[in-house]
Amino acid sequence: MTAIRNVAVGLVPAIALAACSFEAADPTPVSRPTAPGELLVRVETVGGLLPPLDAQRSVPAISIYGDGLVLVPATVPDIFPGPAGQELEAFHVGAGVLDEIVAAAGVAGLHGPERRVEQEGPEFVADGGATVITVVSNGQRHVTVADGLFDVEPGTPLRRALADFVRRLVELRNTATDVVSYEPSAVAVFVAAFDEAFVPDPQMVTRVEWPFADPLATWGEPVPPDGLSVDVRCRVVDGDELDLLRDALRTLTTTTVVVQDSEERILAWRPLLPDEANC
């Protein structure tokens, strides 16, 4: 698990609200999304060496929308096996805070063209993940990718500015007073081949009947390969189907194997975010 994933679940020490405020704002006027479901800012981790389906079940460290809705990962118990899916928590921030975030993004250089900030210095981490910061402003989507941003101490002024921006975003959770569990209207369900090599104790494996009507072997559509993971397939589950099986999905763990006839797969799921429609 990379450092930004740890930050996302609240492992960064809490700091005073004043320290979390977005100061030194860029005075240049910038338009931003204001409607529900319109993404304003997102921070997520991609890449890195992870067990099968860990990348698929992960959710962004934070997603902030134009109406002030903020979604963050719910805390996952530090036990093995862990849940097969990742839950979310929700809270809201006011329009003034959103404006400050947009201005602070400008100070950090996040309103410009897409760019990649590579690692520098002797502490290079070959298999670290990359932090992806997406900011939507002036009707455009601006993406900054910083390799290994939280795997080593940020050394350059730019990397320090990016790390500080991310930390202040994540700290919004520590000052929120209206945090609730988020019930998604749709989830992405992933399946992949089962490999006992990824289970430290085969006795921890539990097998359950495949709960869906669609055949397990041809579930959904193939997920584009990333060169590291096993072959993965995914389909969106929503509506009555999700209402029927939501509780069943929450009982599955990372060592649950779903079975249909001679087919066996591991399963992972994650909530679809308000700006997402597909896996």
Task: Indicate where each model-derived feature is located.
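A short, structured loop/turn motif at beta-sheet edges
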Residues: 66-67, 94-98, 135-141
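Bacterial N-terminal signal peptides that target proteins for export
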Residues: 1-9
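A short-motif feature that recognizes glycine-rich, charge-decorated loops
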Residues: 73-113
